[in-house]
């Protein structure tokens, strides 16, 4: 994944090589990439963060939404109001603002598009196991 991205023009800022020896894990890797890099069309499960510099929030939103995946998105900003506006525009099942870990047993977990249908956890996750009944009464 990283090698393919680098061969398509990405630059490794940190990580990118597995340390020698046994028991080594792939290190956290940060890449700077152009908006046409194939890594942006992948659903990445691992410590790899491709970073794209954009000129506007709208450009960043369009680029993020251009993928067929949508499990989680991350927004970092000193302007919380702006970050929430961006988060609301992202086609993603979960959005973390200014944090890396978003898991919470009380919150729904799941994605949009090819990243899943339905939710686990929270009220949304238990709802599909409930029998909903409507009773209409006229008195």
Regions found by a protein language model. Name each.
Residues 9-17:
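Short secondary-structure junctions
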Residues 18, 25-139:
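Conserved C-terminal structural/oligomerization subdomain of aldehyde/semialdehyde dehydrogenase
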């Amino acid at each position: 994944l990283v090698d393919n991205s680098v061969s398509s023009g990405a630059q490794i800022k940190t990580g990118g090589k597995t340390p020698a020896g046994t028991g080594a894990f792939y290190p956290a890797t940060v890449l700077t990439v152009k908006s046409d890099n194939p890594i942006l069309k992948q659903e990445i499960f691992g410590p790899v963060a491709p970073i794209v510099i954009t000129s506007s929030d709208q450009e960043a939103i369009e680029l993020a939404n251009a993928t067929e995946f949508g499990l989680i998105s991350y927004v970092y900003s000193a302007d919380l109001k702006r970050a929430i506006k961006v988060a609301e525009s992202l086609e993603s099942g979960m959005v973390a603002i200014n944090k890396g870990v978003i898991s919470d047993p009380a919150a729904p977990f799941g994605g949009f598009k090819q990243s899943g249908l339905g939710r686990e956890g929270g009220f949304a996750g238990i709802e599909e196991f409930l029998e909903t009944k409507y009773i209409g009464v006229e008195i």
